[in-house]
Amino acid sequence: MFRTGKAIPIAPAKEDEALLNAAYDAVAEALAQGELVAIFPEGRITDTGELYPFRQGVKRIVERTPVPVIPLALKGLWGSFFSRRGGPAMSNPFHMRPFSKIALEAGEAFAPQAATPDVLQATVLRMRGDWK
């Protein structure tokens, strides 16, 4: 799944600074080639269904490769196979609620200099509404 999606491995600098730098290089290369790059700016999967604070990754990416940033809000993942509700994420194939509805909402693009972690998080929270 990750290979098909062209996932770029990443780790916090405190765990593996070389891998983090390689990830930023791979993102810059993908963007320069016109690829779309999706990131999860929280840096981890939520244990509660609520958003964690957005980290500085998007800011660092657009400082190096200034591109528009499109905020995306995932809705309905909490309680699904991909959430940590009831245990580790992606560990139980029967974890997904029957007929659960998952949605993705895209917002308006931000100019690179306007795409700060605080602005993006506020936008995603507004887009997500009461969904988890």
Show where each model-derived region lies.
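A cross-family acyltransferase "interaction/gating" segment
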Residues: D47-A115
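Catalytic-site beta-strand/loop segments enriched in glycine and acidic/polar residues
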Residues: A28-K59
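Short, amphipathic alpha-helical "lid/cap" segments that border enzyme active or binding sites
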Residues: Y24, A28, A103-L104, P117-V124
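Membrane-interfacial amphipathic helices and adjacent loop/beta segments
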Residues: M1-A32
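Short, cationic low-complexity segments
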Residues: A122-K132
